[in-house]
Amino acid sequence: ALNLSAKDLVVGMELGYPPFEMSDKTGKASGISVDFLEAFAKKNGYKLVVKNIAWDGLIPALKTAKIDLIMSSMTITDERKKVVDFSIPYAKANLAILTPLNSDITNIKDLDKKGKVLALKRGSTGHLYAVKNLKNATINLFDKENAAILEVIQGKADGFFYDQLTIYRTWQKHQDTTRAILAPFQENPEFWGIAVQKGNAELKKELDEFIAESKKDGLFDSLGEKYLKDVKDTFKKNNLEFFF
């Protein structure tokens, strides 16, 4: 039955991180986050409206109430908590390393040496990690991750850090020039949360309850199977924790 009283739930995400947030062939928003929010909206009597917003514009859009929430594979950080409220975590991600195929890099310590070059995306968690923990390496920054990846492919850099999924997918495409080191090296994994406006306790509570339910009833498992089966299998084979 059509619920005529359904209230719009306006969601901001950057449709540039498949298979979490992406657009299908017709330009319609799709992916794990969209499926999850469709289910959330249905259960709570909302009508889902997705707005594709560039990453840097997401938090400003939330602060000015142009959107009700952000679900965009966003890591919960202390910095962000100052300006938005987060749901409980729905996923966790670890940084991984992409290195040239014939490099001598086997772990993070190998990169913390004079003469080692890192190609990193400016402002990414990999960039922040390197500044804090790798004092001896040279850090070269790029605005786009693809430019940083190219440095590794061409052998101009010894390492690129990004989330495990991106590193795995990049290695799949460039197996003749790169290697992926997927074992986690951070002390703490990164947790992803859904951001709501500061003080929006009601929406946060609904989201928290639905996330907890979805972990129990297998919604996240089935989304993982639907969108990331090969990755899930690879992670399992290598004893790596999956996102959910």
Describe every region a protein language model picked out.
Residues T125-F142, R179, I211-F244:
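Ligand-binding clefts/hinges and TM-proximal coupling segments of bilobed small-molecule sensing domains
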Residues L2-M74, K82:
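Extracytoplasmic small-molecule ligand-binding "clamshell" domains
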Residues V34-K43, S103, K109, R122-S124, ...:
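Extended ligand-binding regions for polar small-molecule ligands
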Residues P100-V117:
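Flexible hinge/capping segments at coil-to-helix
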Residues V34, V50-P60, I105-T106, N140-Q154, ...:
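Short helix-initiation/N-cap motifs at beta->coil->alpha
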Residues L15, A91-T99, Q164, Y168-I211, ...:
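Periplasmic-binding protein-like
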Residues G12-Y17, K51-D56, A65-T77, L101, ...:
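Beta->alpha turn/N-cap motifs
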Residues G57-P60, S72-K82, Y129-K132, I153, ...:
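A ligand-binding cleft/hinge motif common to bilobed small-molecule-binding domains
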